[in-house]
C-alpha cells in the first residue's frame, strides 16, 4: 500500500514506503504521515505532522505488543505505550 489509507471499517493502514509522505484524515484533522524506516531498536517508525499548519504532532513506532506513540501537546509530551492503532487514532481525535 503506497499511502496510509482508511480501510472500509474506518481503521487506519500505515504505509512502509520510506520517506514518502501521505495525508490521512483522522477525525476532523488532516495529518501528514511519513515512514522513516526502522529506529535503533529495529522498530518501524513514522513521524506525524499537522498538514494544515506545519507543526509536529508526534512519533509512532511499532513495538512487539503494540504501538508506541509519543504525542506532542500544548502541555508537553504524552507517551502512549503498547496501544492499538485504533487507540492512536482516538488519541489524535479520530
Residue ranges and their predicted role:
Residues 73-83:
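A short, exposed loop/beta-hairpin motif centered on an aromatic-Gly-Thr core
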Residues 6-7, 22, 55, 81, ...:
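Generic low-complexity segments that are intrinsically disordered, proline-rich and/or Lys/Arg-biased
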Residues 35-39, 61-67, 83-90:
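A short, sequence-level motif marking secondary-structure junctions
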Residues 93-94:
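Charged, low-complexity intrinsically disordered segments
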Amino acid at each position: 500500500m503506497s499511502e496510509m489509507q482508511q480501510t472500509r471499517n474506518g481503521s487506519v493502514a500505515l504505509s512502509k514506503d520510506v520517506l514518502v509522505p501521505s495525508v490521512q484524515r483522522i477525525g476532523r484533522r488532516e495529518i501528514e504521515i511519513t515512514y522513516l524506516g526502522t529506529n535503533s531498536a529495529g522498530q518501524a517508525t513514522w513521524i506525524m505532522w499537522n498538514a494544515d499548519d506545519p507543526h509536529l504532532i508526534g512519533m509512532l513506532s511499532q513495538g512487539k505488543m503494540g504501538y508506541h506513540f509519543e504525542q506532542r501537546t500544548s502541555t508537553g509530551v504524552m507517551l502512549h505505550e503498547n496501544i492499538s492503532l485504533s487507540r492512536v487514532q482516538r488519541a489524535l481525535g479520530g
